[in-house]
């Protein structure tokens, strides 16, 4: 299935880094990010859902070969804003569960301060192949 343009751009800004436990990723926020003109005009701020998507993509990259889709957003605490050009460090853990779901918990920081804590459940994405019958 095709990835939406926002998810593709978030993925392009994300780099997985070595971590002794769990996963660590760096999100380098592109000043040209497609949602900035509307969120908010004159004072761009990265929408919180984009941080949720970055956590999902970082967990997906760490699990290698597992395409994930957001299931349930268990909790999201946003403690700061992310602006164009910021770098966000995402540190988290992803665990597989017997029901096939993946649980991801992550702390996000920027400029040395925690900016968000996100906990979510994801399911494996189903690839759509062929035309409908």
Regions found by a protein language model. Give the residues of each.
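Short, solvent-exposed secondary-structure boundary motifs
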Residues: 1-9, 82-86
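Catalytic strand-loop segment that frames the active site of acyl-thioester-processing enzymes
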Residues: 4-46
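Residues that act as N-cap/strand-start positions at coil-to-secondary-structure junctions
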Residues: 8-10, 70, 88, 114
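HotDog/MaoC-like acyl-thioester-processing domains
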Residues: 11-22, 84, 93-133
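Generic structural detector for well-ordered beta-strands
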Residues: 26-28, 77, 121
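Hydrophobic beta-strand-centered segment that forms part of the acyl-chain substrate-binding groove
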Residues: 56-94, 101, 123
